[in-house]
């Protein structure tokens, strides 16, 4: 039996300047409109870029150039009628936008919310199979993949066009990064989730504030600080006793990153030997980046 095709509806999309990503509680204790989706996109991209700066240089080959742009795109799915209805209602501004009058936020349970729209939007505009999954899973669950970017549920062509406008602002003249494997995609999902968490912090609540000077402070507060290492310490200075022969022999064998096995009876100091060997690698710049003191 043939099923009749659902007729395409005519939608009018909000301008990007009115598409909210966040609300916040203002100084009077009232829930108010917070950052726009574009602002939040730029914030999370900047957070991701700073996180990458602070990772050990040896890990950077795992991250494709321009990965911050993927992170910025994670919430493009919030540019849709159901999410905007919900958030403007919370902010007390729903009546200002007749374009949202017929939207029903309760329907989002059918497609698992805005992350699934992000998945569909990215699938529609670029060819890498992993990028839609990265943005679609930034809340830790797989997206609903059976909806297309321009379907009625997601706001039709008008809202997909608005999402494409947002993506164009994020990308500029640059192309999409090349994500080459599922393993790499999983790594980038983690980066996206952490950057979103930091970029959603209260430091960025007030939309009137310039967000750029707050990025470093937010990343610092989240604990992603450069390693500070006091160099030149002896084994005895760290542990209060001179190394045993087996410890000294092990330490001398550790000349670079790798897997080393020290077999010795309990009480011979295997833990201290391993810790001091790791300290030596950090001191020599062979185990990631550090700041010497």
Features from the language model and the residues they span:
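Post-Walker A helix-loop "phosphate-sensing" segment adjacent to the P-loop in P-loop NTPases
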Residues: 280-290
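Accessory nucleic-acid engagement/destabilization modules that flank
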Residues: 2-230
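Walker A/P-loop
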Residues: 256-278
């Amino acid at each position: 039996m043939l099923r009749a095709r659902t007729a395409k509806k005519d939608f009018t999309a909000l301008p990007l300047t009115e598409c909210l990503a966040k609300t916040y509680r203002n100084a009077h204790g009232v829930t108010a409109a917070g950052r726009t989706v574009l602002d939040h996109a730029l914030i999370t991209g900047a957070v991701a870029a700073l996180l990458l700066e602070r990772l050990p240089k040896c890990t950077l080959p795992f991250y494709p150039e321009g990965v911050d742009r993927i992170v910025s795109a994670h919430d493009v799915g919030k540019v849709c009628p159901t999410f905007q209805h919900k958030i403007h209602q919370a902010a007390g501004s729903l009546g200002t936008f007749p374009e949202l009058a017929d939207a029903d936020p309760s329907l989002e349970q059918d497609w698992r919310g805005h992350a699934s729209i992000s998945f569909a939007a990215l699938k529609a505009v670029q060819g890498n199979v992993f990028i839609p999954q990265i943005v679609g899973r930034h809340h830790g669950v797989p997206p609903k993949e059976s909806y297309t970017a321009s379907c009625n549920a997601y706001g039709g062509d008008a809202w997909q066009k608005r999402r494409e406008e947002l993506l164009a602002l994020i990308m500029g003249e640059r192309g999409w990064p090349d994500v080459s494997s599922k393993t790499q995609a999983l790594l980038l999902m983690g980066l996206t989730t952490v950057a979103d968490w930091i970029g959603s912090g209260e430091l960025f609540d007030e939309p009137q504030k310039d967000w750029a000077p707050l990025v470093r402070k937010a990343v610092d507060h989240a604990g992603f600080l450069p390693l500070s290492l006091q160099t030149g310490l002896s084994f005895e200075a760290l542990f209060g006793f001179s190394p045993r022969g087996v410890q000294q022999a092990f330490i001398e064998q550790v000349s670079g990153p790798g897997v080393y096995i020290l077999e010795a009876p309990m009480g011979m100091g295997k833990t201290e030997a391993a810790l001091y060997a790791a300290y030596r690698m950090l001191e020599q710049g062979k185990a990631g980046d550090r700041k010497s003191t």
